[in-house]
Amino acid sequence: MPAGVSWPRYLRMFAASVLSMFAGAQVVHHYYRPDLSIPEIPPKPGELRTELLGLKERQMDSQKQ
């Protein structure tokens, strides 16, 4: 008995934690929408854009006001 609980309860809790982890990863994946394309030629240093465009737009809007 791991952690002082019965095996069926332990397995249920383990399954619930794994499923919630997968669901959370899916939500984050859909929210950020990563670019999964692989370029033919790797970008040169300083060429790769990694900033969040929505955040950048909000910051520019707040600076204009």
From Swiss-Prot:
Signal peptide: none
Membrane-traversing stretches: 10-32
Expression (tissue specificity): Highly expressed in skeletal and cardiac muscle (at protein level).
Gene inactivation effect: A complete loss of mitochondrial respiratory chain complex III resulting in severe growth retardation, lactic acidosis and early death.
Recorded topology in the membrane: Single-pass type II membrane protein
Domain of life: Eukaryota
Mitochondrial matrix side: 1-9
A GO BP entry: mitochondrial respiratory chain complex III assembly
A GO CC term attached to the entry: mitochondrion
UniProtKB keywords: Membrane, Mitochondrion, Mitochondrion inner membrane, Signal-anchor, Transmembrane, Transmembrane helix
UniProt key word Transmembrane helix: yes
Broad class of the protein's primary localization: mitochondrion
Residue intervals annotated with topology Mitochondrial intermembrane: 33-65
Subcellular location: Mitochondrion inner membrane
Pfam families membership: DUF4516 (PF14990)
Function: Required for the assembly and stability of the mitochondrial ubiquinol-cytochrome c reductase complex (complex III (CIII) or cytochrome b-c1 complex), a multisubunit transmembrane complex that is part of the mitochondrial electron transport chain (ETC) which drives oxidative phosphorylation. Mediates early complex III biogenesis. Participates in regulating the levels of electron transport chain proteins, and therefore energy supply, in response to changes in energy demand. Also required for cytochrome c oxidase complex (complex IV) assembly.
Protein family membership: Belongs to the UQCC6 family.
Listed name of the protein: Ubiquinol-cytochrome-c reductase complex assembly factor 6
Organism: Danio rerio (Zebrafish)
